[in-house]
């Protein structure tokens, strides 16, 4: 999830191709290129799809190191703008991120793209990729309390990632039902 690895575009493509082929051949309507820490990897996957499966719709979601930077150090605006040339990408966003990063990142993305915006952050628990452990800090707002802010900031596809559960997903569903 840190993006601190280097492969060639061809190596990224060889790694992802078997799963992509299985999913596309099974008839998926949209392919999730999710939890991506590295722009070069995303672009390699998109080039592969453009050549082999040009009709396949996808969405891309990045992991973040802060509200303006994806995990490999690429500025978020650059990572979002890089997707604009790919007509197959119908939505962009972030996932597996801390709650406090979501709203500022959404506002940033909304200024760059007209594509649908996706967020599915972790609950308030925080993951440390070095120790591979979760901790529960005291936060100023809960997942449930922040959903309206994310919607207001432009998110139209909202879900949950690590340590979210039925309570958080119900809160998203209830909010969407009230605000259609």
Protein language model annotation of sequence segments:
Residues 1-180:
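Domain-level signal for soluble alpha/beta catalytic cores
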